[in-house]
Structure formats: C-alpha cells, structure tokens
Amino acid sequence: MKKFLSFKPAEDFLRSLKKSSQWFLLIIIVEVTITLSFEGYVFHHFRLITVEKIDVFINAMVPSTFALFCMACPYLLYTAVDALLNKDVIQMSALLIFHVSLFCLSVVQYFQIFSKDPRAIFLSALYLIDPIRLVTSFNYHERIVVNSHMLLFYLKPFVIALPVLIGVTCILLSFLVYKMNKAFGWIMYQQHGPDLRMRRRYLVYKIFMSLIKSDYYFCLTATVQYAIFFSTISRVGLALTILVFPCTIATLMTCRYAVYRENRALLGIVQFMFMCGLAYFIYNCARLYLGVDYGDIAVANICMLVFSIVTIIYLFTTIVVGFYCISNFGYGLREYLRYIHQKQKVNAAPAVPKVRMPLDD
C-alpha cells in the first residue's frame, strides 16, 4: 500500500528537470487549470439559457467548443510531460504550434458566442414557436431573453481572457523552448552521433511521431464535435460518426507500429486510411460551410468549421511526412531506433550502489 501511494517516481522526475523545464511544466499546469475553470464556468451558465427553439442554437454551439478545450487540456499536459521526459525539443515545438491553433480557435469562439444578440435570436425563432404558447407565455420568454443578454455581458471577461491566456503562455513557452534547445543540444548529439544523414532520417521520424500525437487530438475532437452536432440533426449521422472513433484509434496505433517496424505494406494501408479520413473531414467541412440540412446552426458553428480546417491541414501534413518516412525505410533507421531506445533505458536505469566488502582477519 505504501508503494502504491508513493510519489517517488514523480519526485525523481521533477528533481531531474532543470529550472527551465520546471518552469515549462508549471506554466502548462497553470494554463490547463485556468482554461478548464473558465470553460466550465462559461458552459455551466450557458446551459441556463433555454428559450424554446433558441436552445437549439445554444446546444449546437457551446458544447462543441467546451469539448474542444476540455480535450485540449489533457493533451497539453500529457505532451508536455512526455516531451520533458524524453528531452524531445521537436515535440515541444509541436506543442507551440498547437498553442497557435488553440489561440485562433479561442478568438473564433469569442466572435461565435457574441456574434448574435439573444433578442435577435428570439425574434428570428418566433415563427417556430406554437402561436398559442407564444401568446400565453410571451412575457416569460421575454424575461428569459433579457436575463440571457445580461448573462452574456457577465461572461464576456472570461471568454476574452482565454485567448489572452493562451497567447501569453505561447510566448513564455517559446522562450523556454529556446533555452531548452540549447541545453539539450549536447545531449541529443551524444545520443544520435555525428552521422548527418541518419540524424535527418531520425528527425523526420520524430516529426511524424509528433504529428501522429496531434492527430489523436484533432481527429478525435473533431469526431466528438460532429457527434454532438449530429445528435440534433439525425440519428443515422450520429451512428456513423460514432463508428469513426474506433477506426481512428486503430489507424493511428497501426501507424506507429508500421513506422517503427518499417513495414511498407502496412504503412501504405495506413496512408490510404488517412486519405479516406481526409476525404471525410473535407466532406463535413463542405457541409458546414454550405449549410446543407443545417440551417442557422451551421452559421452559428463557425468554430467547428475552423477546427475542421485545422484538422485537415494536420492530416494532410501527416500524409506528406508519412511518404517521406517510407522513402527512408531500409537505410538502417530501424536498428538506429533500437540502439537509441536501449541507450535511453541504460541511462534511465538506477546506478548500482557500491557495497563495501569486509576484509578477512
């Protein structure tokens, strides 16, 4: 029980970090905590706004952005810890690019939430409400709309603070990554050796692995957004969207195995699945943009459209780098990866304590 409750591995990990790495992890933890708090506060108060058909607008908009940021926070924390554990500057740089995309999405979220006045939404939805119920409960609905307008006013500082927080965090992390790149330079040289060609192949491999980790977040989060969105449109679309989950996870796991084992046939199948996924996201992106069968909800969900475009860019980049990885097969990268993995195990192993042998009299 004491071993189970022991925090010694975490303590050893924190002690092994330098000051710049500790600040890097601390900033990520603070950012994740504040982001979850702000998004949870906004989401909770938005759920209070329910006015007949107006709640369709709210239900289609707010949960999708809430799911986006809620899934981003564990991804940020995991990627930061993994990058510091492996002293992977490439993954840290990928984390900075991820922050830029998250900053753009937080700005889009602000314009999405405050683009329409609740009164205008209410008046545009009058024809959808039963006339008898409208006459008998108009004052009730009007009072809720006024309260909703005041609620949006009180929530505005929290929604504005989110892109400011992400932007400042990105600037601070950029400075720390620059310092850590200098500190880890000699360590990386000791691990990889002076062979420039092999180092370039290894660099492409690490970039591809970072893209795969990003694809986990973007593809699965986009699928969650589509599932929330399609739940208000059709059950068939919801069922098909849920089926994308296991296919995405299986494809990305197979991709990691195929690259590490240098299996051309398996990675070729994975590349084909990536192209199918790219076509799937382009199709949904086009439907969101054109507003087919969605009506006003498509106009409201700009954030989902922007997120789909970012997912398409990441997936397309993964496909391009994947073909580059296939061209590097057969040049000793597989053995090189095994050598680095064994070397990291040896370096991570605890030192054998020196035991004094007593002298015989």
Swiss-Prot record:
InterPro entries, A to Z: UPF0658_Golgi
Transmembrane segments: 23-43, 56-76, 94-114, 120-140, 158-178, 207-229, 233-255, 265-285, 302-322
Subcellular location: Golgi apparatus membrane
Claim: Transmembrane is one of the keywords in the record: yes
Disulfide bonds: none
Keyword tags: Golgi apparatus, Membrane, Transmembrane, Transmembrane helix
Topological relation to the membrane, as annotated: Multi-pass membrane protein
Key word Transmembrane present: yes
GO cellular component, as recorded: Golgi apparatus; Golgi membrane; plasma membrane
Similarity comment: Belongs to the UPF0658 family.
Record PANTHER family: UPF0658 GOLGI APPARATUS MEMBRANE PROTEIN C1952.10C-RELATED (PTHR34391:SF1)
Name of this chain's protein: UPF0658 Golgi apparatus membrane protein C1952.10c
Protein source organism: Schizosaccharomyces pombe (strain 972 / ATCC 24843)
